Amino acid sequence: MKPFQGITFCPTAINNEILAKKISKKIIKLGGIFSKDLTRQVNVLVVGSTTNTNKFKFAVKHRFDIIFIDIQAIDDIYQLWLSGENILPDSNTATMTGSTYEMLKILYRRFSFKYLHNFNIFIGRITDTNITSIDSLVRSIKKLGCSSYNYQNFVIKDTSSHNDDDDQGQNGQISIFVTDTLLGARVNAAIEQNIPIVHFKWILDCQKRSALLPYDPYYLLPNIKDLPYDSIGSNSCDCWDKINTTFPTNIDAQSSLQRQQSSSTLTPSLPKTSSLLNKFKPKGEKIWDKAMSLQQHSKTNFSVLGQSPLSINNKQEDLSDNSTLIFKNCAFIIHHIFPGNHRSILTKIVVQNGGKIETSYLSGIYDHSYYIIPSNKALDSFNDLPEIIDDNDGIVTEFFIERCLYYQKLLHPIDLWSKPFLSTIEFQVSSSSKLLHHEFSSSPFLNVTITGFSGVELLHLTKVLNLLKPMGINYVEYLNKSTDILLINLAALPSIPKTHPLWSNEFSDLFTQFCINNNNDDPGDNNRKDFQNNSILRNSMKRKIEYIKKFHSIPVVTPAFIFKLLSAASGENNEIFLNNIKWCIICPRGHKDDFKCKIKKPYYTSISSEKKYQNNDPKIDKTILLKRNNSSLSEHSMKDTKNELLQKIRETDSGRKKRSVSSSIMDVSSERQMPDTKRIKLESLPKNFVPKQIKRTTSWGTIMSENVPTEQPTAISNPEEIPRTEEVSHTQVTYGSIQDKKRTASLEKPMRRQTRNQTKELDS
């Protein structure tokens, strides 16, 4: 049975159509009915951005049987349902009163709308102390969601005028002055600032009605100063006599809801408890709630040691109920890199469960000693971690504390969930192009979806995947055509025998504890059987597997692939194949390289660790550095290696200096000296030597002439006939002297030179 079965929801002040569609889809998936109109069948009114709507005002005045919740409540319940939490009421209680009625009670007690969240309330003088007091009013407005209040000094945070509650539509704070007298300097100052003076009975009536009543005109002190106390605000609601102070449903409505469930099959869920509210939180929160035992109210959140504060709500569940202490005779060293509030939380958890907090690692004194570091910090960022040799001790993350609290026992030996998994963050995952679905998603990241997980494993796996997004692995909540890999819980597949290679490898402890607790035959132990008792999780996993087999063929692997990838990021082997039998359950057909994921490191991390010693000279002998990195050296050999390395560097530096000096000398000498080749001595020409005339084939004046001779004489007919002395002695082409040209011109017939103008006439 779904949690909202038989409950009708109606929205108000949700102007965003996209948001309204999302809310309606979630309500329908949870088994509820979504109605845009406020009809008689409506049980819950979902309030959006403001309470200044006709639906809200009508429901407050006339509908005593309606529960008011906000949008966030729908989102929180939907996330709980997806994660496999038991949000249905207890089976024994539901049998007597009806499951729908009990679900409405949970909505009323846990998720009622905090309608004073945008109010700035100043509490002045209270003359009638027999009815209430300032401390009592402060407690009341805090329960109603008001966080901005003052009863000592009159400080105006919102100087704008507030004549009525219509200003709620502006999403601004509403300032009011609560008192029962019009006398006093503070009251006069509030009147000058146009701040409404409201009788304190308005707060008490809002708490009784479980809704925001209009203070204008029913509670404005100038209007009702002469009225008796019982008559104040009597007209603000028409159903005072029908309101139940514990739950807004009368006997007739309760009977009607019971009849709706008469033919329904109720699902056993939570064990009987005096508080249904505390059972409505995710496992991660309930672990810390039990441990901390604080009285603090907060919204549902999956974070345990994350960014948001812890949500603690009930004092009745405490670790005093446990007969044994989880961390008895265990010592913990909390690294100083943890934030102060996280350190205090871890310290209190460890001490309350029998553990000891030490400042340094002590081996052999306690049964177990653990050094705790943050899960989101890489190991290569630490330089002060101790060297732990004892098998009973180890370096763990805060995941270890959470897992021990979740399973209510000390988990030994330490599994892969609890060990530091992030060795470095300086790497990128490059996947095969055939593995990525670029036609549906342009992202170069590897899109990963999970199924079959619940409880603390679900919490930790999502945290691990979110940490890997900068490295190229993108966690997506839903399975679709853009998904590249499906991570599945091996312990949720009972058809795979324990002798299979999926179980007989170094990653098997990822699923051992989950398998032990969900396969426990004890019928009374239902607290950890989230997957076994939740048909929604099992059906969801089956549907995802069927979808992959029929419509979207992608690899289905266990989280061992992720942990292998993380371990390979610090090693030399930088290629991981998805079709490995250690983690692959379903794999499409294809070549081995089609399922390859390559780990790429930056240059300064991909080269060996000897980079810190090298001086970028390629002639340095690196064998010493490689030996030092690849072998464990004694103290004596390390000194020898150091001296040998320094000697090599000195020799290289001196050799480089000699080469640089010699090269500079050669450069200077080469500039000053002439080439070493002998100059050829030019022979003097005889006095009566007359050079031959060289006839040019054409010139600028004869280029466009038609009388240019077609047969062009060759200046040199045979190169071999030129004397050697003439070839050597001349350095440029000689065209003859002026006298030779005159003598030649007198012997030949003069040729008339064609000009450009004559050429144009010929063309015409």
Swiss-Prot record:
Any one GO biological process: mitotic G2 DNA damage checkpoint signaling
Domain annotation BRCT: ranges: 1-99, 129-220, 322-418
Protein location: Nucleus
Chief place of localization: nucleus
GO cellular component: DNA replication preinitiation complex; nucleus; replication fork
Coiled-coil stretches: none
Region (Disordered): 651-675, 710-764
Pfam families, alphabetized: BRCT, BRCT_2
Compositional bias (Basic and acidic residues): 739-751
Keywords for this protein: Cell cycle, DNA replication, Nucleus, Repeat
Single GO MF descriptor: protein kinase activator activity
Other facts noted in the record for this chain: Present with 540 molecules/cell in log phase SD medium.
Subunit structure: Interacts with SLD2.
Function comment: Has a role in the initiation of DNA replication. Required at S-phase checkpoint. Required for the association of PSF1 with origins. Also required for the proper activation of RAD53 in response to DNA damage and replication blocks. Multicopy suppressor of DPB2 mutation. Overexpression restores the growth defect conferred by POL2 mutation.
Protein name: DNA replication regulator DPB11
Organism: Saccharomyces cerevisiae (strain ATCC 204508 / S288c)
